[in-house]
């Protein structure tokens, strides 16, 4: 019989490593860059991920061409089911899709949405959004 003794910190490190491996690795491109590509794509986990031109054209109408794609939707266990969106342009886009008012003079660059809203966003922008997961063991 083998008895393994680990501290909570060790367990936390292991779990964080597992979550990190689950999350996609990607480099974001600007809307401008993607619009100029014949076959718009980003590399996610070493594989080519096609971006639908229809989504890019839609985003061009509601956002700056400096918008970084994919838009990151962060699922954080410490947020009780909320999904975090960061970045001024990203917040602007998600707000418009959900029909939420935003103060254009606000410096706020973070917003939180919930699962029903996430479904709306993912339906509208399936190839230009990316879910990532963040695990918080100790809040």
Swiss-Prot record:
InterPro entries: UPF0216 (IPR002746). It comes from the Archaea. It holds the Pfam family DUF61. Belongs to the UPF0216 family. This is UPF0216 protein MJ1224. The lineage of its organism: Archaea, Methanobacteriati, Methanobacteriota, Methanomada group, Methanococci.
């Amino acid at each position: 019989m083998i008895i393994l003794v680990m501290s909570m910190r060790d367990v936390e490190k292991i779990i964080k490593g597992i979550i990190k491996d689950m999350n996609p690795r990607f480099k974001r491109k600007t809307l401008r860059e993607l619009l100029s590509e014949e076959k718009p794509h980003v590399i996610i986990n070493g594989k080519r991920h096609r971006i639908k031109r229809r989504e890019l054209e839609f985003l061009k109408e509601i956002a700056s061409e400096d918008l970084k794609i994919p838009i990151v939707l962060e699922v954080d266990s410490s947020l009780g089911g909320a999904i975090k969106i960061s970045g001024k342009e990203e917040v602007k886009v998600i707000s418009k899709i959900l029909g939420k008012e935003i103060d254009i003079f606000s410096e706020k660059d973070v917003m939180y949405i919930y699962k029903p809203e996430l479904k709306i966003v993912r339906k509208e922008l399936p190839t230009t959004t990316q879910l990532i997961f963040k695990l918080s063991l100790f809040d």
